[in-house]
Amino acid sequence: MSPPKGNLKARGPRADPVPVTVFSAPELLNVAEAEGMIFPPHVVDQLVAALDAGKHVILTGPPGTGKTTLAYLAAELGRHSMLCTGYQPTTATSEWTTFETIGGLQPTPEGLIFRPGLFVEAIETGKWLVIDELNRSNFDRAFGQLFTVLSGSAVVLPFRRSGQIKPISLVPHGVEAPADTDPIRLPASWRIIATMNALDKHLLFDMSYALMRRFAFIEVTTPPDWAYEKLLEGDGEIVQKLLPLRTLNNLGPAIFVDAKRYVHRRQRDDVTQSRLLYEIFYAFFLPQFEGIDEHKAVQLYKLVAKHLDPPEQAETQRVVAELLGEELVG
């Protein structure tokens, strides 16, 4: 995994080795803590158990709980446990079709050739597939024949690989390939780990029951208060002043960790504590309160303003009022 710098959701695979050989919950917890993240042990236990049991997994929970980071770390641990060759990160979109996921014909100077999609490419290379924001896809349109494959049956695709005369088939481990096909076999340990914001379940498209049955759902809950305090030791001391905001919204630790990293960099500059606190509030926390009512807006302002000097208090009152869409009273 990348070092704990930068945006958590932007991380991808890295090549340098991690001294881990056992795919277990204790190992995953240790790797997570080394990355500056603390997850409830029962969440990690569930994730490891589900993957060990042969299930694909969807991690759900509030924004900022570190779902994407946990997915990456689990896949990276899988790589160093020889369960996969690596992992392929992607973000789902509403435009996904089977062309993006399974593949399709692509024109070339030599004619039309089959271009594998994300899923087929991951299967062929032995990589686990990590999908962020899965709920943003149209599941039935995007998964297509994968429904059959994920349920343990082989499926024949209407495509042929370059130089082949037989159609491609996707064949789960332990299943006989259909006759007269060019099989692409799913490794026994191949997995999909996807994330879904609990608050976004109603957005764009509803997940069909057919797809839900093919995944284990695991809720990534927020850790206890002591975990936040531990994560914010050192440079994060100023960020601890914003921990009471959790009484207004179930803010995950990743938001606070990102704020701590910003503080670490910004403290090199000539900036007052009041200004710095306002900056991290505006940059990392204010967007999490979109859609709050007037009562919560007043509480939000008061919780932050008591730590600020008059100039930053005025700015905070203004931006909270803009978020509310009307003048802040109280």
Segment roles from a protein language model:
Residues 1-330:
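C-terminal regulatory/interaction module of P-loop NTP-utilizing enzymes
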